[in-house]
């Protein structure tokens, strides 16, 4: 018998994994991975654990509201940096000179549009800024490995017909 889950997907008993402790390679490449119910859940869990130097986050101007929500709920002040029409970050000086305690960046639609930030992320980390990469859009991209951020988050359910799924690494 099938059960309705999330009012969007049907799943039968024979489609469930039982006693599977092995992490798929597309997730294990991120190192220590914690599975969550969603990308938003991964971000919320992370924000409960970290203590930034100041509760201000720097976010790309083109971003899903579900990424913004955990920061708002945790009491962060939100600041945005611009991306151009190709979704490449453009406010490099704003990012460099920001006093934010947390910096979130991402590639879009399978492309490493945030690649330009690689060196800057290392600089921010050396200044005790917590850096987070959201790899939801680039999870299966063969373009590049993630930037060396402190944390990686992602939503798995954007890629599969499943009702929930996210991760924190």
Regions found by a protein language model. Give the residues of each.
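Active-site phosphate-binding strand-loop segment of PLP-dependent enzymes
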Residues: 85-169
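A short beta-strand submotif of the Rossmann-like class I SAM-dependent methyltransferase core
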Residues: 35, 59, 105
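Conserved PLP-anchoring active-site segment centered on the Schiff-base-forming lysine
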Residues: 46-95
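Hydrophobic anchor at the start of a short beta-strand
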Residues: 33, 78, 131
């Amino acid at each position: 018998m099938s059960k309705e889950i999330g009012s969007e997907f049907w799943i039968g008993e024979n489609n469930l994994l039982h006693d599977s402790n092995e992490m798929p390679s597309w997730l294990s490449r991120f190192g220590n991975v914690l599975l969550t119910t969603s990308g938003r859940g991964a971000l919320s869990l992370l924000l409960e654990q970290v203590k930034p130097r100041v509760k201000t986050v720097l976010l790309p101007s083109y971003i899903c509201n579900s990424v913004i929500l955990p920061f708002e709920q945790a009491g962060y002040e939100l600041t945005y940096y611009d991306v151009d029409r190709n979704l490449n970050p453009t406010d490099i000086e704003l990012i460099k000179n920001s006093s934010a305690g947390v910096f979130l960046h991402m590639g879009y639609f399978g492309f490493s549009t945030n690649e330009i930030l690689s060196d800057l992320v290392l600089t921010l980390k050396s200044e005790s800024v917590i850096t987070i990469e959201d790899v939801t859009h680039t999870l299966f991209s063969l373009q590049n490995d993630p930037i060396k951020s402190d944390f990686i988050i992602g939503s798995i359910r954007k890629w599969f017909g499943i009702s929930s799924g996210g991760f924190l690494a």
